[in-house]
Design a protein with these regions (language model features):
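Extended catalytic-interface subdomain
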Residues: 272-406, 410
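Acidic, low-complexity/disordered tracts enriched in E/D and polar residues
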Residues: 1-67, 604
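A conserved hydrophobic helix/loop-capping motif in glycosyltransferases and polysaccharide synthases
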Residues: 132-140, 154, 166-168
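Long, compositionally biased intrinsically disordered regions
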Residues: 27-30, 34-39, 107-120, 124-125, ...
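Catalytic donor-sugar/metal-binding loop of nucleotide-sugar-dependent glycosyltransferases
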Residues: 438-454
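Short, acidic, metal-binding catalytic loop of nucleotide-sugar glycosyltransferases
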Residues: 149-160, 184-185
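Long, charge-rich, low-complexity alpha-helical segments
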Residues: 2-7, 42, 50-127
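Active-site-proximal specificity loops/subdomain of glycosyltransferases
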Residues: 176-247, 264
Length: 614
């Protein structure tokens, strides 16, 4: 070590060390998340979450390793550490020695070794039949008509598939129009598009309650009618899960066009990632039409339907047929690394959105990666328009495999042959909570987000409100519920989906009994966590964007200041999407959690009955 520094960059012990080999120079490596056990003498024992390997290091070394959670080359880690820790400036050889020692100990994750483990495994391509397509609609017959026209043009209706229109319309006239659309479309295109509206739903609900009287309350909550002022997005999706049980299921929102739109720059690579989607911005509403894929117009063919249920090596063979290069791990969080195994299966497939991304907030525009945000702020006039107009390509440029299901698209594939949870039938963010619950039931399950999009063009013009990004995060019921479940996921030792589904019901019964004080504490904790996370991310983005135009930098600084100011104000005491005063909101939340728990207890029996009796 150089004598000018007191930084203790050395080891005390190495336990279970591997042979003395350095990582290949082209490899990408990252420090494994470790359990840390403080010792005396400024030392800490580490045990790797992924490898189970152990070592003892000085606390200074541990601090340095905490800077190595991103997958980078050895040289990139070295340069980053010298920049992040001034005491290490000029100590290239010492840094390399320590990182190589950590690699030999088994606590550095290797992209090359993982890629070898996940080598593609060729599999027979399945015919795109035996699928269940469910269109979900509510009081939008014009949108349904437009969607069906695009399906007639771009989709091959195979006799082995089943097709449903699940109608949640409240107005009788719209119900009649949708039923007529199904009948006329079926006649004209020689396909059985089944209308599944209030009458059909009521019929099946009655039969379910008669067959399963002990679960009557749970069935009514998940599948029954609610007051007209309630948003029941999840209710329609529960009917889709039941109709599609035992099949590959495709969920389609009514306000999309059934066609495939490619990104301007499309890759043929696959990646394992923890990152969010890319964004591309357009100056006019119809520019995307030049990106339509005329040769493969159906967004649900190829890997979208074919990858459902496949193991990761099989899905890689289907997507690209090539072994993952080290760069494919660049955006992977080490915490997710161990979830990508040969036995991991794709349970969810999705594609991006062209037009309206479907998000109520636009704060994520300031959290985009470098390439996307450069496109965002390239022109001031267009930048100002992008803050309000929902007209962008939002998706992937690669075949992106994820172990998180935080964003599910307007066209979603679900492997309903597996045990799945029901959606929460009320409120928004039903897909966010569903994704977290799928991950809870199947910890090694994957989502494949595909490198194309479908046009999402609501008939009504939607715009983001001015100043929306400056508003501090506030929880709705289901986003908060997803947060609470995420904290429990790693602590459940059960290995079977059935047992984990039972524990889900217990989890929501426990939430239903939470005290006011504890609920207020958790609301404050999650709000502060989101706010401070946004502040950190935006501050880092601002620091790494000195070349960005002043108008964007000023706006980003104003958002950071607004979020910092919100830290001095009282935390929310209720839920933004439940009416009433905060006490009423908390009481309502507890009642809804209790009702959902009864539904979770009923769900497995409902699914089994529907498969036998539909």
């Amino acid at each position: 070590m150089n004598s000018h520094t007191s930084y203790n960059f050395s080891f005390s012990y190495n336990l279970n060390a591997q042979p003395d080999t350095k990582p290949p120079t082209e490899d990408l490596i990252a420090f494994d998340f470790c359990h840390e056990y403080p010792l005396t003498g400024e030392q800490t024992m580490l045990r790797g979450n992924t490898s189970g390997r152990q070592t003892i290091v000085t606390n200074d070394v541990l601090y340095s390793l905490h800077q190595c959670y991103q997958f980078k080359t050895l040289k990139e880690h070295n340069l980053h550490l010298q920049k992040a820790i001034p005491d290490l400036a000029g100590q290239t050889e010492d840094i390399n020695h320590v990182l190589n020692s950590i690699s030999r100990t088994g606590l550095m994750l290797s992209a090359i070794r993982k890629a070898e483990e996940l080598a593609p495994e060729p599999t027979e391509r399945e015919e795109e039949s035996g699928l269940c397509y469910c269109i979900l609609t509510c009081d939008r017959p014009e949108a349904v008509s437009r969607l069906l026209q695009s399906m007639a043009k771009n989709h091959r209706f195979l006799p082995g598939n089943r097709y449903f229109l699940i109608d949640d319309s409240r107005q009788t006239g719209h119900q009649q129009q949708n039923r007529a659309l199904c009948e006329s479309f079926s006649r004209e295109h020689t396909v059985n598009l089944q209308y599944f509206g209030a009458r059909e739903q009521g019929h099946f609900q009655e039969r379910l309650e008669q067959a399963l009287p002990e679960h009557k309350d749970g069935i009514a909550f998940l599948l029954g009618s609610h007051t007209p002022d309630k948003a029941t997005y999840g209710r329609s999706r529960n009917w889709a899960l039941l109709l599609g049980a035992g099949s590959k299921l495709v969920l389609i929102d009514d306000d999309v066009l059934f066609q495939r739109v490619n990104p301007r720059e499309q890759s043929s690579q696959a990646v394992l990632t923890s990152s969010t989607r890319d964004a591309d911005f357009f100056s006019s509403g119809d520019t995307w039409e030049t990106l339509s894929d005329e040769n493969r117009p159906d967004p649900t063919t190829h890997a979208f339907s074919g990858a459902m249920g496949k193991s990761l090596p099989q899905a890689l063979a289907l997507a690209t047929g090539e072994k993952l290069p080290p760069e494919a791990f660049r955006q992977l969080n080490p915490h997710d690394f161990s979830r990508f195994q040969r036995h991991s299966r794709v349970l969810i497939t999705s594609c991006g959105s062209m037009g309206d991304p479907g998000t109520s907030s636009n704060i994520w525009l300031y959290l985009l990666d470098r390439n996307s945000r450069r496109n965002f702020y390239a022109n001031e006039e267009q930048y100002r328009r992008h803050l309000f107009d929902r007209n962008l390509w939002f998706g992937r440029k690669d075949y992106a495999f994820l172990n998180t299901f935080v964003l599910i698209s307007q066209i979603t594939g679900v492997d309903a042959r597996e045990s799945l949870p029901p959606y929460f039938p009320l409120q928004r963010n039903e897909d966010l909570l569903f994704g977290e619950m799928v991950r809870y039931l199947h910890p090694y399950a994957l989502q494949l987000d595909l490198p194309w999009a479908a046009p999402h063009l609501p008939l009504e013009k939607r715009r983001w409100k001015e100043g929306l990004a400056k508003q501090p995060p506030r929880h709705g019921l289901l986003s908060f519920s997803a947060e609470m479940l995420g904290r429990q996921r790693e602590h459940n030792p059960a290995t079977t989906p059935g047992r984990r589904l039972q524990s889900l019901a217990d989890h929501y019964y426990c939430l239903a009994e939470i005290s006011d004080q504890e609920l207020l504490n958790r609301l404050a904790q999650t709000t502060l966590q989101h706010t401070t996370s946004h502040i950190r991310q935006m501050s880092d983005i601002l620091a790494e964007s000195p070349e960005a135009p002043g108008y964007w930098r000023e706006d980003l600084q104003a958002i950071i200041q607004s979020l910092q100011q919100s830290l001095t104000t009282p935390s929310p005491e209720g839920f933004v999407d439940i009416s009433g005063d905060p006490q009423t909101q908390r009481d309502s939340a507890r009642s809804l959690w209790r009702a959902y728990a009864t539904g979770l207890q009923a769900w497995e029996a409902c699914t089994a009955w529907m498969q036998q009796n539909r």
